[in-house]
Amino acid sequence: MEKIIEFSKDYSSIYSKIIRMLKMQKGKEYSLGDITNYANLILEKSKCINPKRCQTLIVKITKEFGIAVYHEAMEKDINGCIKIGGDTKQKYKGNNKVILLNNNLNEWQERVNLAKLLSYYLFDYLGSVYQADNQFYYAKLEKKNHDIDKIADRFAMDILTPKELFVEQYNVAVKINNQHYFVLRYLSHYFEIPEQFIKRRIAEIQYNCT
């Protein structure tokens, strides 16, 4: 799994600051550009990037937001869920906020789905006028295309494959071997996420550059 990097004191409170920012903007209709900005802010201030492989330390980031991560058996069409409040603290060793990942996911799939579920906490819980502190919250990550899932997908894309770094490594891969299969495999291993996710990121960046 991820190598943990210690934060400098200057950045230790970035997570609490982001939480406060989102609470102050409850009810805001976030654009996908807003989501990108939040993902970039987290990456910039937390310095939560593995220096050897440069993959985002998404487990570390999630835990810094005070969310514990567990694995459980679930139905195959559910990738995970997030639970806050209710009996969560009693069931999960004193943790009031947990993300549960389907234990049939591989490690790279876990990274993508963890990032998406973290976005549920940030934008569907903290940023919602319908949620109050410590109120029970539960949401499943299913294979459906609700508005929050568009936001979740945007957040995962930006935090796991930062655009500048992604373009840089795409160019590195192409110089080594410009065959499509090689580029996909190179980037998938570099960022430690599934090739399907890489395909979409490449297509998105190429479309925006035309």
Predicted regions and their residues:
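Active-site hotspot residues in diverse enzymes, especially metal/ion-binding acidic/histidine motifs
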Residues: 1-210
